């Protein structure tokens, strides 16, 4: 049997909807209404937007509710659709940064030429000049050989 003090205590009463909501707020934090959320702008608005409600007329048919969906793609990834029979989506990912100094071979050639020019300037011109003449002769022979190979390939392609 319950006593009068036990019946009045809050533990003995069954939970109402209002008490349940208070318990949820304590557990999950306060519920924020939509107007407060839009003013605050901390939470993004819903992506499902309803169209403006029309005035209800008794003779008019009920109109279907249309929804507009707003999507925002991240700026780092852009999706491009290929205009082909099969419309597949490809993802473009930013590539590796390229060096601004040019190719490594070009840089090495510039360094070699600078060393040779420094050698000529310092007075050891005779051995360096002989080496440069030999290098020039070998490069000329290589260029002539490459030209001969290219012309032979071209003639072979014209015969086909």
UniProtKB/Swiss-Prot annotation:
Look up the domain of life of the source. Eukaryota
Q: Which InterPro entries match?
A: DUF4658
Query: Is Transmembrane a UniProt keyword of this protein?
Result: yes
Cite the record's Basic and acidic residues compositional bias ranges: 12-25, 33-42
Compartments in which it is found:
Cell membrane
The cellular component terms of Gene Ontology attached to this UniProt record, alphabetical and capped at eight, are:
plasma membrane
Give UniProt keywords alphabetically.
Cell membrane, Membrane, Transmembrane, Transmembrane helix
Q: Where is this region: Disordered?
A: 1-69
Record's keyword annotation contains Amino-acid biosynthesis: no
Q: Where are the transmembrane segments?
A: 101-121
- Membrane topology value: Single-pass membrane protein
Q: What is its main location?
A: membrane
Q: What is this protein called?
A: Nutritionally-regulated adipose and cardiac enriched protein homolog
The species this protein belongs to is Homo sapiens (Human)
Q: Which gene encodes it?
A: NRAC
């Amino acid at each position: 049997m319950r006593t009068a003090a036990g019946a009045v205590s809050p533990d003995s009463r069954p939970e109402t909807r209002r008490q349940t909501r208070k318990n949820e707020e304590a557990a999950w934090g306060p519920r924020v209404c939509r107007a407060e959320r839009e003013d605050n702008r901390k939470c993004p608005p819903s992506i499902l937007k309803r169209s403006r409600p029309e005035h209800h007329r008794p003779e008019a048919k009920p109109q279907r509710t249309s929804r507009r969906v707003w999507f925002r793609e991240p700026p780092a990834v852009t999706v491009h659709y290929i205009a082909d029979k099969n419309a597949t989506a490809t993802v473009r990912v930013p590539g590796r940064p390229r060096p601004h100094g040019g190719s490594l071979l070009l840089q090495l050639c510039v360094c070699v030429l600078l060393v040779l020019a420094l050698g000529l300037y310092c007075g050891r011109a005779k051995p360096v000049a002989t080496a440069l003449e030999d290098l020039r002769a070998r490069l000329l022979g290589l260029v002539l050989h490459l030209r001969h190979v290219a012309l032979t390939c071209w003639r072979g392609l014209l015969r086909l």
